[in-house]
Amino acid sequence: MDAYLKDQFDFTGVKAALLVEQSILVILRDNKPDIPWPNTWELPGGGREGQETPLECLQREVWEELGLTLKEGSIIWSKIYPSMLDKDRSAVFVVGRISQEQYREIRFGDEGQEFKRMPVEDFIKAEGVIPQLQERFKDYLVGKEIDN
């Protein structure tokens, strides 16, 4: 895990591609016209609260959205990007793994319409997924190929 995930610095939030075998856990955003990307598939995560570190922000968001305790050892890749909502600020994107058992234990919160597993190949090509998240996940795949 990258050390900066435990550091306090100025960032807007964290999004996580949580892999369950060869699939990614995705959440269908609420269909409300006053939110960015309504009725679009996205990844768990959200905005920073107070002086949270990226890891603390991610763990809180995953707990609130999915009822899962995400251990830092689950994180396999991360990178800092420009925020999707404020290009002058930073956001963090992580890739992590959860087990089939953890997936079955999800208690879906009150943000979003539904969650599901989407095959990796579908996620990177699908219409109706936030494009920036697709691009960030592709960066992980490219980096993984280079490392192998």
Model-identified regions with their sequence ranges:
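Conserved Nudix-box catalytic region and its N-terminal flanking loop in Nudix hydrolases
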Residues: 23-64
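A short coil-to-beta-strand element that immediately follows conserved catalytic motifs
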Residues: 69-79
